[in-house]
Amino acid sequence: MASTFRLSISFLTLILFSLWVVEAHTSRKLISIKEKEGQDISHLLKDGEFDDPSLYMYFTLNDLKLGTKLLIYFYKNDLQKLPPLLTRQQADLIPFTKSKLDFLLDHFSITKDSPQGKAIKETLGHCDAKAIEGEHKFCGTSLESLIDLVKKTMGYNVDLKVMTTKVMVPAQNSISYALHNYTFVEAPKELVGIKMLGCHRMPYPYAVYYCHGHKGGSRVFEVNLVTDDGRQRVVGPAVCHMDTSTWDADHVAFKVLKMEPRSAPVCHFFPLDNIVWVTK
């Protein structure tokens, strides 16, 4: 049984995980921690501007109003290419810590210096890292553990609502997952007096969600955006992190927004495979 499970995970790793990692993975840009200071971002620049479309998800609090136009990239992973969500029983059979990296790479038949090996190391590093001041964070490795940890963080006796980003087009059109100019066609609606957790799907051989929130430091909005040609609409959550004073000074958001590090709120949209939990 154990060998069959190991082989099935390895097969999924080679076929699904490999395809996923080589594509742009937006969630990794939304995490406000890094393993070391001074990360080189020169590979993201072209002629002094950012050349990675997945970075076009950040905006400022002043942008959050009716009529504002922003260049945004909403990326959708092909669900058939996403690694599977394990049960708790399956996930508990596999260690999930950076200290077991060599074992895990061998378990999944992945080399350390491959894109997949580097992605595994990065995900484990983020999940093992201590929370920054005022932050609560965890990684869910199964549906059961994800729900349990969300309830533990937000309260066992509260009603929870799940929010995701949705892209909609008329039936005769296909969705274009590319950079588009989007305009706020309705005034963003703030969800007042709620708790929130943002859960970002991370690159790993099976589904892992990195969830984090900031105590009293985030504002959540429901937004309604439309492309210039009016053919594509996006509805979903946006969050503004009001206190960035403890963020890494090299966080890519400060560079994308061309702001002084830790000086002002940072807002962002969510990729389509991310989850936002809020109290009702």
Swiss-Prot record:
Cleavable signal peptide: 1-24
Cellular component aspect of the GO annotation: Golgi stack; protein storage vacuole
Query: GO biological process annotations for this chain's record?
Result: seed development
Enumerate the SMART domains for this protein. BURP (SM01045)
State where it is primarily located: other
Phenotype on deletion?
No visible effect on seed development, but significant reduction of 11S seed storage protein content in the mature seeds. Enhanced drought tolerance.
Q: What induces it?
A: Up-regulated in the root by dehydration, salt stress, osmotic stress, high temperature and abscisic acid.
Top-rank taxon: Eukaryota
Q: Does the keyword Signal apply?
A: yes
Stretches of the chain forming a coiled coil according to its record: none
Enumerate the UniProt keywords alphabetically.
Answer: Golgi apparatus, Signal, Vacuole
One Pfam entry name: BURP
Where the record annotates domain BURP, the positions are 58-280
Compartments annotated for it: namely: Protein storage vacuole; Golgi apparatus, Golgi stack; Golgi apparatus, trans-Golgi network; Prevacuolar compartment
Tissue localization of expression: Expressed in cotyledons, radicle, floral buds, open flowers, roots and developing seeds, but not in leaves. Highly expressed in the root tips. Detected in young leaves, hypocotyls, stems and mature seed funiculum.
Q: Which InterPro entries match?
A: BURP, BURP_dom
Keyword Signal found: yes
The entry's function note states:
Associated with the protein storage vacuole formation.
Domain description: The BURP domain located at the C-terminus has not been identified in non-plant proteins.
Q: Which PANTHER family match?
A: BURP DOMAIN PROTEIN USPL1, BURP DOMAIN PROTEIN USPL1-LIKE
Query: What name does this protein carry?
Result: BURP domain protein USPL1
Origin organism is Arabidopsis thaliana
Q: Provide the organism lineage as a comma list.
A: Eukaryota, Viridiplantae, Streptophyta, Embryophyta, Tracheophyta
